[in-house]
């Protein structure tokens, strides 16, 4: 069996601009994002840590690393999903996030689940 199929995690993202928590006059733009992590591989895997790269429109980069997500290190058996919501604050109305989750499969193999780049944007800023 191909390694790629054995250890395969799909990640999808939904984002929202939080106007009530943002203050554009103070260069504070707050976004929520909901991540769905799905194990489409053939072995169970546990999310151990995360690594985010957050870039605003001025190319200011923040890197965030830490254990788990929202205080959890979920174990995903084949076919299972885990969903969580979190947020990010930027100094510009548009930015991007991308990164990876560090996973450990039940057989002890360690691998990264890549989080594809996604856009955070205040409504009516992007055309």
Swiss-Prot record:
One family from Pfam that matches here is: DUF525
**What are the TM regions of this chain, as residue ranges?**
none
Q: Can you tell me which residues the record assigns to a coiled coil?
A: none
Query: Taking every annotated instance into account, which residue ranges of this chain make up the domain ApaG?
Result: 3-127
Q: Which Gene3D superfamilies match?
A: ApaG domain (2.60.40.1470)
Instruction: List, in alphabetical order, the GO biological process terms annotated in this UniProt record.
Output: error-free translesion synthesis
Output the InterPro entries linked to this UniProt entry. Answer: ApaG_domain, ApaG_sf, Uncharacterised_ApaG
Task: Give the top-rank taxon of the lineage listed in the UniProt record for this protein.
Answer: Bacteria
Cross-referenced NCBIfam families: PRK05461.1
Protein name as annotated: Protein ApaG
Which organism encodes this protein?
Thiobacillus denitrificans (strain ATCC 25259 / T1)
């Amino acid at each position: 069996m191909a390694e790629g199929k054995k250890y395969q995690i799909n990640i999808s993202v939904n984002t929202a601009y939080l106007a009530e928590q943002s203050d554009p006059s103070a260069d504070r733009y707050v976004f929520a994002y909901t991540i769905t992590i799905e194990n489409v591989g053939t072995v169970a895997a546990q999310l151990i840590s995360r690594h985010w790269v957050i870039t605003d429109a001025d190319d200011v980069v923040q890197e965030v690393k830490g254990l788990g997500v929202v205080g959890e290190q979920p174990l995903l058996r084949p076919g299972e999903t885990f969903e969580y919501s979190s947020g990010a604050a930027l100094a510009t109305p548009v930015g991007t996030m991308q990164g990876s989750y560090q996973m450990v499969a039940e057989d002890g193999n360690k691998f990264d689940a890549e989080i594809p780049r996604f856009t955070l944007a205040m409504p009516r800023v992007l055309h």
